[in-house]
């Protein structure tokens, strides 16, 4: 009974967060400092930043920061002790941000962006859904891809450059 009650509370809380996502306030944002701020929330050795160049992206800094935190946390949880890689590049007026992990991969990729679907015990199933909503509301895209260089997942965010 307690487990069902806790699951129902997670569901209600998740639904409320999905329903009240504020409209983004996009503006030019320097990506390197935003990424550094997100990385600081985790053990430094667990996140390898593979890009040194700074680019500007047109985004809501607070919302994009939350997306980065969510994707980094997912990667770290999936990869066990393996570090997560974070990198970005700019090309043709678009900025691509990639976060790669060394976890088991994509078990059921068709459901990953379905609200309340989760592969984690105790998960609410809203993190990826919220992340995609945030990115798409800012004119971008978010996709999860199987890594080509071994096991794991690569989250790819594409947003307009500033």
Regions found by a protein language model. Name each.
Residues 1-29, 33-44:
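Conserved DHp (HisKA) dimerization/phosphotransfer helix of two-component histidine kinases, i.e.
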Residues 48-56, 62, 91:
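Conserved catalytic submotifs in the C-terminal HATPase_c
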Residues 74-79:
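Short helix-loop "hinge" at the ATP-lid/N-box region of the Bergerat-fold HATPase_c
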Residues 83-93:
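Short beta-strand/loop element within the Bergerat-fold HATPase_c
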Residues 106-116:
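Short conserved segment of the HATPase_c
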Residues 127, 131:
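Short alpha-helical Gxxx[C/S/T] motif in the catalytic ATP-binding
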Residues 135-136:
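Detector for a conserved hydrophobic position within an alpha-helical segment of the HATPase_c
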């Amino acid at each position: 009974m307690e487990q069902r009650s806790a699951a129902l509370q997670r569901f209600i809380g998740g639904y409320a967060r999905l329903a009240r996502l504020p409209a983004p306030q996009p503006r030019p944002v320097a990506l390197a400092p935003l990424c550094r701020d997100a990385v600081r929330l985790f053990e430094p050795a667990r996140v390898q930043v593979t890009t040194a160049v700074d680019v500007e992206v047109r985004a809501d800094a607070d919302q994009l920061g939350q997306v980065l935190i969510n994707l980094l946390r997912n990667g770290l949880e999936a990869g066990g002790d393996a570090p997560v890689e974070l990198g970005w590049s700019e090309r043709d007026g678009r900025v691509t941000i990639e976060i790669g992990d060394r976890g088991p991969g994509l078990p059921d990729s068709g459901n990953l962006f379905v609200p309340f679907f989760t592969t984690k015990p105790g998960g609410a199933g809203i993190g990826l859904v919220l992340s995609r909503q945030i990115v798409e509301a800012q004119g971008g895209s978010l996709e999860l891809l199987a890594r080509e260089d071994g096991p794991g997942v690569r989250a790819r965010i594409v947003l307009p450059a500033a």
